[in-house]
Curated annotation (Swiss-Prot):
The active site is at residues 334, 424. Catalyzes amidations at positions B, D, E, and G on adenosylcobyrinic A,C-diamide. NH(2) groups are provided by glutamine, and one molecule of ATP is hydrogenolyzed for each amidation. NCBIfam families: cobQ, PRK00784.1. One of its GO terms (biological process) is cobalamin biosynthetic process. This is Cobyric acid synthase. One of its GO terms (molecular function) is ABC-type vitamin B12 transporter activity. It comes from the Bacteria. InterPro entries: Class_I_gatase-like, CobQ/CobB/MinD/ParA_Nub-bd_dom, CobQ_GATase1, CobQ_N, CobQ_synth, GATase_3, P-loop_NTPase.
Length: 494
């Protein structure tokens, strides 16, 4: 089998971007390439169609990487998805379907079954594609987790994958991170680490060159290239490390405030708003930051009831009520929409202790009620909203009942300036986004095309990878494996 593992010195080092860029570069060469991540921990996910026609759920990053590879996204590309519901509890999605939940204290108990499923998924992809580019998670040097690892070096050992390590030089300390990562690995794992990729470099490459030569000399491994920091490069974000917002280039922009919930999910829903030239998009957790917002978005969450309590504890509920009382628009998406209703019920303990009926009062801005069901809805709806075609994707346990005063809106409800939808991704549709901004803010169509913008970003990423990395050498590495003479670096992990 031919493949490559893209590991990193830390979380957010750039593994997802490098994987996507390699997928696009290899696809341009006519290579049938697939992305893979054995286990992803993220509340940003996507629905794609399974082999039986039903919806399956994978990490958003792997979905985008499949687009970069110009192939069809599928559950095998992210066989295990962990969706954090609290600091100590995660819901598990296995091969695209709900599998159960795990607590951090009992995580090791069910890990073998997940590891076996992940390895089977990789093997199935490797049998159908020329090359599989696998993305690691966090750092492979988490030596306390080595025994049960199946996403970093555990996967590399299973499939004999040569590994490159990505480091973010913008954070500082990248040389120590590279050396320390390799040195902490066991000998059999070090033998699979072929070299390094420096990411997010700004400055004079001549000043960097001596350090790269010393790194190659000390480690006995090559540097496959240095990717520059680029201001226009964004991808659908994998986790909550990228809640930065986007500013309009000109003056006089309208302000969109997205409430930064503790368990925010699918915050890529607002990426399309960030493309609009007349909008500033900011994330806010302070009620004062909502005072001058022209539009507020209450996004999805993996813990609707807990995040509603957080909202009230911070007095953000009052800020939302004041905003709506002033006639200004408010959009709730999935869990955010459910908060806008009259009541939320959790009779099966989906978000709380099993068997305990939980009922909380909503914000009362929409005449709807929500009841959580054990069955998870995963689907790709199409329809109409505001007089134009619309589409999106649904990932939820909530069942909505609309009252007499609620007008239907994209699987949700509308009442005056308050909109609620169960459809993630609806604003990525240009016609729906233009109609919504015209209805709520009086904005004329900008002509922005979200799908074209995403494709341009993927092409830009592919261009950067081809220009700054030795793609031919990496493809040769994927096909033929590591050289047999890589040195062992002390101390090594026991």
């Amino acid at each position: 089998m031919s493949g490559l593992l893209v590991a990193g010195t830390t979380s957010d080092a750039g593994k997802s971007a490098v994987t996507a860029g390699l997928c696009r570069a290899l696809a341009r060469r006519g290579v049938r390439v697939a992305p893979f991540k054995a286990q992803n921990m993220s509340n940003n996910s996507m629905v794609c169609r399974g082999p039986d026609g039903t919806g399956v759920e994978i990490g958003r990053a792997q979905w985008v990487q499949a687009l970069a590879a110009r192939t069809t996204p599928e559950a095998a590309m992210n066989p295990v998805l962990l969706k954090p519901a609290s600091d100590h509890r995660s819901h598990v999605v296995l091969m695209g379907k709900p599998w159960g939940e795990v607590a951090s204290s009992s995580w090791c108990a069910g890990r073998r079954a997940l590891a076996e499923a992940a390895c089977r998924a990789f093997d199935a992809l490797a049998a159908r594609y020329d090359v599989v580019v696998a993305e690691g998670a966090g750092s492979p040097a988490e030596i306390n987790l080595r025994a049960g690892d199946y996403v970093n070096m555990g996967l590399a050992r299973h499939a004999g994958l040569p590994t490159i390590v990505v480091g973010d030089i913008d954070r500082g300390g990248v040389f120590a991170a590279f050396l320390g990562t390799v040195a902490l690995l066991a000998a059999e794992d070090q033998a699979l680490v072929a070299g390094f990729v420096v990411n997010k470099f700004r400055g004079d490459s001549d000043l960097l060159a001596p350090g790269l030569r010393d790194l190659e000399r000390v480690t006995g491994r090559r540097v496959y290239g240095t990717l520059p920091w680029h201001p226009d490069l964004w991808l659908d974000s994998e986790d909550a490390l990228d809640l930065q917002g986007r500013r309009a280039a000109g003056t006089g922009a309208r302000r969109v405030a997205v409430v930064r919930l503790p368990r925010i999910s699918n915050f890529t829903d607002v990426d399309a708003l960030g493309l609009e030239p007349d909008l500033d998009v900011v994330f806010a957790s302070d009620p004062r930051a909502l005072d001058d917002a022209d539009l507020i978005v209450l996004p999805g969450t993996r813990a609707t009831i807990a995040d509603l309590a957080w909202l009230r504890a911070r007095d953000l509920d009052r800020a939302l009520l004041v905003h709506v009382a002033a006639g200004k628009p408010l959009l709730g998406i999935c869990g955010g929409f459910q908060m806008l209703g009259r009541v939320i019920r959790d009779p099966y303990g989906i978000e709380g202790p099993g068997g305990q009926v939980t009922e909380v009062e909503g914000l009362g801005l929409l005449d709807v009620e929500t009841a959580f069901s054990p069955h998870k809805v995963l689907r790709l709806p199409r329809g109409e909203g505001l007089g134009v075609p619309a589409s999106g994707y649904e990932i939820h346990h909530g069942r909505i009942t609309r009252g007499d005063t609620a007008e239907e809106f994209l699987g949700g409800a509308r009442d005056g300036p308050v909109f609620g939808t169960m459809w993630h991704g609806s604003l990525e549709g240009d016609a729906l986004r233009e109609a919504f901004l015209r209805e709520t803010l009086g904005l004329a169509p900008s002509g922005s095309c979200f799908l074209a913008a995403r494709e341009r970003r993927l092409d830009l990423l592919g261009d950067l990878v081809e220009r700054h990395l030795d793609v031919d050498a990496l493809l040769n590495l994927a096909r033929h494996g590591c050289p047999p003479t890589l040195p062992f670096l002390a101390p090594g992990a026991p």
